[in-house]
């Protein structure tokens, strides 16, 4: 009977069978980006175009405290956003949940400008004196030659670049606006960045003192593929993140991993080696080449790949690969201790970890090899989208006007100071009277001046038209003056005005520098 049933099924499936055909073809199985599963989401195979959202910048935003309609408590409101509870805190400020007038939730990141200026000054004092590197940024006045990284313009340029250029699925884009709030002074105390809200928070909370529950193999692979695509895109833009860790990987409501926090990132010339001499980031995620004193220039790309490997280790095992409570012991373990995968039975994953966490940066796996590794692609059965498609959208450089807007906050103040400096400079020039110029001897000369005698009697005086009568005697008296002072008097220079002009010009130049740099 079983054979007869099988034969009937085969007969029904034959081309000549009289079975009724299906009126519509069956739909192909759909892939969803909401749940990591054995089948990778569509974003790993095809890049959906992301529309560029215009970023609104508001200077001197309106701030007020209002009574909540729910419980009567006071709410802090900035423009249309009501600031709610704090969800995180960093070195420059806190991150709060904000709700707009339509009930949409956003993440508002607060930046203390005082801390930004303090850090910019400290970086200026520690500025390296190594060989100069070409800079990708347009040259701006009041700044020293570039070294390929952000020096004096680090803080505001980094905020400016993030809010203008991060339009990518695995990199958190700026969602709404930039707000400056102060106390009515020209220089506000805080800046706020309104960004997309990743409601599921950080991918994992793991520290030297805290462990977490590890994720299964499929979730680790899915989110690590997101991380590969995001960091590959940043490297194509000439950006090295330098602080990749689980705390800086957020999960959206539809389970997309997004890279955040570019506070210590560096930007280089496109298609360069991206070598840096700075040490930045979390100690437990630093590569071995940065755990030594006077390490010199190291590859920023290789450092990011090491941090990606440590992040993957945390996701898979719920702990850090090197756990030491002393910084010196931690650095020694990172440099010398081999990586241990406790209880790992997957030899392919173990091979991946050994290649990512290679002590020698020259032998460490590179991004092109990493995206093709058998564990990442399931032995070639689930490849990532091509690199050319992932990095197709290279962002244009910001214009000088946009850079000035990001650095000076309001360039009108700089223009006003420059106009004032130009006016002070004009005061140094000789003041010509409307009537023919007379020498101190009383004779009229239209084309040249006459050198005064070496000595003159104090009683001698000449009446000349002057806009400042009370300065007349002092201006025209050449008695007991040095030779160059007598020349200035004859040519129309006022000694006190000359000195005052120099002082005012120097003060104006200092104000221009302070406004442009800090």
From Swiss-Prot:
Any GO molecular function:
ATP binding
Write down the chemical reaction(s) this protein catalyses. L-seryl-[protein] + ATP = O-phospho-L-seryl-[protein] + ADP + H(+); L-threonyl-[protein] + ATP = O-phospho-L-threonyl-[protein] + ADP + H(+)
- According to its UniProt record, this protein's enzyme class is transferase
Residues of the region (Disordered) are 1-72, 119-149, 453-472
Segments traversing the membrane: none
Binding-site residues for ATP, renumbered to this chain = 87-95, 109
Q: What residue spans carry the Polar residues bias annotation? A: 8-17, 60-71
Family of this protein: Belongs to the protein kinase superfamily. Ser/Thr protein kinase family.
This chain belongs to the protein called: Calcium/calmodulin-dependent protein kinase kinase cmkC
The protein's organism comes out as Emericella nidulans
Whichever gene encodes this chain, its name is cmkC
């Amino acid at each position: 009977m079983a054979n007869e049933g099988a034969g009937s099924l085969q007969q029904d499936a034959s081309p000549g069978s009289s079975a009724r055909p299906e009126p519509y073809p069956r739909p192909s199985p759909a892939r969803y980006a909401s749940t990591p599963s054995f089948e990778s989401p569509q974003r790993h195979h095809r890049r959906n175009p992301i529309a560029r959202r215009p970023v609104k910048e508001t200077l001197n935003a309106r701030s007020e405290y209002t009574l909540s309609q729910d419980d009567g408590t006071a709410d802090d409101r900035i423009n249309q956003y009501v600031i709610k509870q704090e969800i995180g805190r960093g070195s420059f400020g806190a991150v709060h949940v904000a709700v707009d007038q339509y009930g949409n939730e956003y993440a508002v990141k607060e930046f203390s400008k005082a801390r930004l200026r303090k850090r910019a000054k400290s970086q200026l004092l520690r500025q390296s004196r190594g060989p100069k590197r070409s800079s990708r940024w347009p040259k701006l006045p009041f700044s020293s030659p570039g070294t390929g990284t952000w020096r004096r313009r680090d803080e505001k340029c980094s905020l400016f670049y993030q809010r203008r250029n991060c339009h990518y699925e695995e990199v958190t884009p700026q969602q709404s606006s930039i707000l400056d709030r102060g106390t009515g002074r020209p220089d506000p105390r805080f800046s706020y960045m309104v960004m997309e809200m990743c409601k599921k928070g950080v991918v994992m909370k793991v520290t030297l003192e805290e462990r977490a529950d590890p994720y299964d193999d499929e979730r680790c692979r899915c989110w690590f593929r997101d991380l590969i695509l995001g960091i590959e895109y940043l490297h194509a833009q000439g950006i090295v993140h330098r602080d990749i860790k689980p705390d800086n990987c957020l999960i959206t409501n539809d389970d997309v991993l997004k890279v955040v926090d570019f506070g210590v990132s560096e930007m280089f010339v496109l298609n360069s080696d991206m070598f840096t001499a700075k040490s930045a980031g979390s100690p437990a995620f630093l590569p071995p080449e940065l755990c030594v004193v006077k390490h010199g220039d190291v590859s920023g790309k290789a450092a990011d790949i090491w941090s990606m490997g440590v992040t993957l280790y945390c996701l898979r095992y719920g702990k850090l690969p090197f756990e030491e409570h002393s910084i010196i012991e931690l650095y020694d373990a990172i440099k010398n201790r081999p990586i241990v995968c406790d209880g790992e039975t997957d030899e392919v994953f173990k091979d991946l970890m050994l290649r990512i966490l290679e002590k020698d940066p020259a032998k460490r796996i590179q991004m092109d090899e990493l995206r093709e590794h058998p564990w990442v692609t399931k032995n070639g059965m689930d490849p990532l989208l091509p690199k050319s498609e992932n990095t197709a959208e290279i962002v244009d450089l910001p214009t000088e006007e946009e850079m000035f807007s990001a650095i000076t906050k309001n360039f009108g103040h700089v223009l006003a100071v420059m106009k004032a400096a130009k006016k002070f400079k004009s005061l140094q020039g000789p003041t010509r009277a409307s009537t023919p110029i007379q020498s101190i001897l009383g004779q009229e000369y239209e084309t040249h001046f006459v050198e005064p005698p070496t000595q003159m009697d104090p009683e001698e005086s000449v009446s000349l038209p002057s806009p400042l009568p009370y300065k007349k005697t002092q201006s025209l008296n050449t008695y007991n003056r040095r030779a160059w002072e007598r020349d200035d008097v004859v040519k129309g220079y006022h000694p006190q005005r000359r000195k005052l002009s120099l002082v005012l010009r120097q003060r104006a130049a200092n104000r221009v520098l302070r406004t442009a740099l800090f």
